[in-house]
């Protein structure tokens, strides 16, 4: 598309997605769920997440590829949920909600991946590096599988949304953790956080 905006009105399941219009925008629409089983490539034009969910299902070293600034997050959720390794190889990209699910290593380049909403760790998926958390972002563990926290749980944690244990899988801390002033730790009813004998420090001291 060379100009204007095309907005999706229904859910889409397809192979890859290439954004390569000279000046146009593809808007993923309102509260939809899209499943792409191939690589997402951002070359030209704009991909606007709207308020929809984009599931990236491909096992690839270029699962999210191209020029990250071609993506406008809106209030969308982008989920990397293949059963295996996936790489976010695009240049610096800002997401709203960002989900890493199913299994495998989701490879990020430090400084190239920012989340302003919820970063959700699901299943047994892990990340190679922590995303950059926006001011009001949060980290959520939403899994029924027991797991040990990884590099995604940075310390000190300064994003005001804090850290939430949201499902029945026991989350075990991997190191001592510090929460800055006014940053919460939420352990929902029926969930379990195992400190592993590491210290939790609140309020930055």
Task: Please tell me what each predicted stretch does.
Residues 1-205:
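Sequence/structural signature of small/polar-enriched beta-strand/turn repeats
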């Amino acid at each position: 598309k060379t100009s204007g905006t095309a907005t999706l009105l229904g859910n889409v399941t397809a192979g890859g997605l290439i954004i390569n219009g000279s000046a146009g925008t593809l808007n993923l629409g309102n509260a939809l769920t899209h499943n792409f089983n191939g690589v997402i490539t951002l070359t030209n034009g704009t991909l606007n997440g709207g308020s929809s969910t984009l599931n990236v299902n491909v096992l690839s070293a270029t699962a999210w590829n191209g020029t990250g600034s071609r993506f406008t997050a809106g209030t969308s959720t982008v989920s990397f949920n293949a059963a295996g390794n996936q790489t976010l190889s695009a240049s610096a990209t800002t997401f709203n909600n960002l989900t890493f699910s199913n299994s495998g290593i989701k490879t990020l380049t430090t400084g190239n991946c920012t989340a302003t909403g919820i970063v959700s760790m699901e299943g047994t998926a892990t990340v190679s590096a922590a995303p950059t958390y926006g001011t009001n972002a949060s980290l959520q563990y939403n899994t029924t599988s027991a797991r040990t926290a990884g590099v995604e749980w940075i310390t000190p944690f300064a994003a005001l949304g804090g850290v939430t244990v949201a499902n029945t899988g026991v989350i075990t801390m991997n190191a001592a953790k510090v929460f800055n002033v006014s940053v919460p730790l939420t352990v929902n009813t029926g969930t379990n956080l195992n400190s592993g004998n590491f210290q939790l420090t609140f309020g930055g001291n």
